[in-house]
A protein has these predicted regions:
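Phosphate-coordination loops involved in phosphoryl transfer and adenosine-cofactor binding
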Residues: 1-3, 77, 145-147, 202, ...
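Beta1-alpha1 glycine-rich phosphate/pyrophosphate-binding loop at the start
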Residues: 2-71, 147, 159-185, 200, ...
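Residue-level detector of alpha-helix initiation sites
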Residues: 10-11, 34, 115-117, 156-157, ...
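Short amphipathic alpha-helical segments
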Residues: 17-18, 41, 121-124, 162-164, ...
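A Rossmann-like FAD-binding core segment of flavoenzymes
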Residues: 68-98, 103-106, 167-264, 304-311
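Glycine/small-residue-rich loop that forms an oxyanion/phosphate-binding "nest" at active or ligand-binding sites
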Residues: 75-87, 92-145
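FAD-site-proximal beta/loop scaffold in flavoenzymes
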Residues: 116, 121, 127-143, 239-286, ...
Length: 311
């Protein structure tokens, strides 16, 4: 029996684990399908305090993980399929059913499952994921050396992906369906200063063109209404994230976009004993440092819950 099971191993879950372990509480992290979360696909993190020269996303995750391990956190590579709420000797406990058939019991649960990449949902896109369509430049950029690619999106992630890809490719074209970008001023300027980056603003992607692998993309010119074809070897989609909460339907209250609702400034969900931290409950900011902070809140909330309920 664990004092707490943490589902998800990004900065929120790992920070919660540090707080729980330092409080002497037995806890385990279920890594999930994307161990380490979004940071494992981030090349350089420049806005996490304590690293004046920046740090790679994977290294930051490894460092936080090592810190939690030092205090006694356990780790398990598995995926939670269901959470069962039961009574045991008059006390509420949770049974977590894993994809390997095992069951873990815990007094509390922290949900830090993060969010996964969104795709466009256009014609021929799904069929060509892995054949020229990708949502991870860090993972796949190397395969496009000396080729032409496009990045779809107008936020910081899109700018970062495009800049990273210029290390390998001949040319990156950023496509955005509006004529203005959502990215921060500094990221916009970095992209605009890069000679390998070109722009297609106010264009809507309509169809992926492929012949065994991606050859181009059809775009709607929003100003003229005409369809244009752009030849490309790779399509990198960077339009945001979808919270990983499908398996939680009926377990905790979720908003219409799939984000977990928490009470006030706490990590408490609609279900007593279940807490949420990180991007899975943050539809606005989605920053590593904020996820870590919310993980700390979850750890403290769990400690308080266990104490108040004599668990």
């Amino acid at each position: 029996m664990y004092d707490s099971v943490i589902i998800g191993s990004g900065p929120a879950g790992l920070t919660a684990a540090i707080y729980l372990s330092r409080a002497g509480l037995k806890n385990i992290i279920i890594n999930g399908m994307e161990p380490g979360g979004q940071l494992t696909t981030t090349t350089e993190v420049e806005n996490f305090p304590g690293f004046p020269q920046g740090i790679s996303g994977p290294q930051l995750i490894e460092d936080i993980k090592a810190q939690s391990k030092n205090f006694g956190t356990e780790f398990l590579q598995a995926v939670v399929k269901d959470i069962e709420n039961i009574e045991n000797n008059g006390k509420k406990i949770f049974k977590l059913h894993l994809d390997n058939g095992n069951i873990i019991e815990a007094k509390t649960v922290i949900l830090s499952t993060g969010a996964s990449a969104k795709y466009l949902g256009i014609e021929n896109e799904k069929e060509n994921i892995g054949k020229g369509v990708s949502a991870c430049a860090t993972c796949d950029g190397f395969f496009y050396r000396r080729k032409d690619v496009v990045v779809i999106g107008g936020g910081d992630t899109a700018m970062e992906e495009a800049i990273f890809l210029t290390k390998f490719v001949n040319k990156v074209t950023i496509i955005n369906r509006r004529d203005v970008l959502r990215a921060s001023a500094i990221m916009q300027q970095r992209a605009k200063d890069n000679e390998k980056i070109e722009w297609k603003l106010d264009y809507t992607p309509k169809k992926v063109l492929a012949d065994e692998k991606v050859t181009g993309i059809e775009l709607l010119n929003n100003k003229t209404g005409e369809i244009e074809t752009l030849a490309t070897d790779g399509i990198f989609v960077a339009i945001g994230r979808t919270p990983n909460t499908k398996f939680l339907e009926g377990k905790v209250e979720i908003d219409d976009r799939g984000y977990i609702l928490t009470k006030g400034k706490s990590s408490k969900t609609s279900t007593s004993g279940i807490f949420a931290a990180g991007d899975v409950q943050d539809s606005k900011y989605q920053q590593a440092i904020i996820a870590a902070g919310s993980g700390a809140i979850a750890g403290l909330d769990v400690e308080e819950y266990l104490r108040e309920n004599n668990l």
